[in-house]
Amino acid sequence: MKNLQITAYMQHFIRQQVMPGDICIDATMGNGNDTALLSQLAGKRGRVLAFDIQKQALEHTKERLKRDNCPENYQLLLESHENMDVYAGTETVSCITFNLGYLPGGDHSVATRADSSIRAVESGLKLLKKGGLMTLCIYSGGDTGYQERDEMLAFIRQLDPHKYLVILSEYANRPNNPPIPVLIIKL
């Protein structure tokens, strides 16, 4: 693996998971990197739902999807990720990805929050089919990042081990609160 950024690390697992025809969710659309990857992997027969509360994220993602010639299998939603269960059925989703924090290049005062992110993860876990994958990139710092990190880690640690496998990784030798990669597999 040449690119050692957390997003590339997580996309390695996403590539192993998503097959043509799958239903996928990008819970935090951002600049559209994961949305584009999910769209390409799911292919013409697949479906991708992407959520963000910032219009700027939606516009950046539209541009990215067009630039990458992604199949038109996506729905970009200007809505909170905690409402994803309105758009997908229980145990139908193969992969859900989250990048918690703020929009890169955007307003740092607008960021994900622990309460809505935990509700979104809870909702997403119900949507995942057996064998489905949820990825979380937990960025800390900023005004609410430490609180979100701590509350999210406490939440995922209490998930039923008979229903979910939670793999928590860390950058052991990186300074300044490096992001935390988390994989959750529905058993």
Where are these regions (language model features)?
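Helix-to-beta-strand junctions that scaffold the AdoMet/dcAdoMet cofactor pocket
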Residues: 19, 42-43, 128-130
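Conserved beta-strand signature within the Rossmann-like core of class I S-adenosyl-L-methionine
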Residues: 28, 120, 127, 131-138
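Conserved SAM-binding loop of SAM-dependent methyltransferases across substrates and taxa
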Residues: 31-45
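Class I S-adenosyl-L-methionine
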Residues: 148-187
